[in-house]
Swiss-Prot record:
Organism annotation: Bartonella bacilliformis (strain ATCC 35685 / KC583 / Herrer 020/F12,63)
Subcellular location: Cytoplasm
GO cellular-component term (any): cytosol
Name assigned to this protein: SsrA-binding protein
Alphabetized UniProt keyword annotations: Cytoplasm, RNA-binding
Protein function: Required for rescue of stalled ribosomes mediated by trans-translation. Binds to transfer-messenger RNA (tmRNA), required for stable association of tmRNA with ribosomes. tmRNA and SmpB together mimic tRNA shape, replacing the anticodon stem-loop with SmpB. tmRNA is encoded by the ssrA gene; the 2 termini fold to resemble tRNA(Ala) and it encodes a 'tag peptide', a short internal open reading frame. During trans-translation Ala-aminoacylated tmRNA acts like a tRNA, entering the A-site of stalled ribosomes, displacing the stalled mRNA.
GO molecular-function terms, A-Z: RNA binding
Family of this protein: Belongs to the SmpB family.
Length: 158
């Protein structure tokens, strides 16, 4: 009998699409996140919002601020606070590199995706980002529109 192949599936829970439009993303990093049991159960039912969240430094540790994971409805009195600070698990070397960029160059750390990896652990993809100005956003929009128009013309006229 043949064995079934293990299919690597990355189940995305929440995605921050605004970050790609509002920021210039420079460096990506995968971080673990410290969660309670009820938070994991809430995430398994695909309830989370990281659109207005960011990461900040406190006591040489990286923390996720303002991420919303709603309360798990079946857990009554042992529930978690939806917008609490959550510790991110990143190596000291990477924390140092990100800390230098944030403190010296005025960058920010933005979460991009919250997902379950192949082993079933919750991971957060974060990026070192620099804010875009209004004219940069318009330029990005023009490039995207021209790319769509070009693809449409190629399909139509071959």
């Amino acid at each position: 009998m043949r064995k079934k192949k293990n299919v690597l599936i990355r189940k995305i829970i929440a995605e921050n699409r605004k970050a790609r439009f509002n920021f210039e993303l420079l460096e990506h990093l995968e971080a673990g996140i410290v969660l309670n049991g009820t938070e994991v159960k809430s995430l398994r039912s695909n309830h989370a919002n990281i659109a207005e969240s960011y990461a900040s430094f406190e006591n040489e540790e990286l923390w996720l601020v303002n991420a919303h994971i709603p309360e798990y409805t079946q857990a009554n009195r042992f529930n978690h606070e939806p917008r609490r600070l959550r510790k991110l698990l990143v190596s000291k070397r990477e924390i140092g590199r990100f800390f230098n960029a944030v403190s010296r160059e005025g960058m920010t750390i933005v979460p991009l995706k919250l997902y379950f990896n192949e082993r079933g652990c919750v991971k957060l993809e974060i990026a070192l980002a620099r804010g875009k100005k209004i004219h940069d956003k318009r330029e990005t929009e023009k490039k995207r529109d021209w790319g769509r128009e070009k693809a449409r013309l190629l399909r139509r006229y071959g």
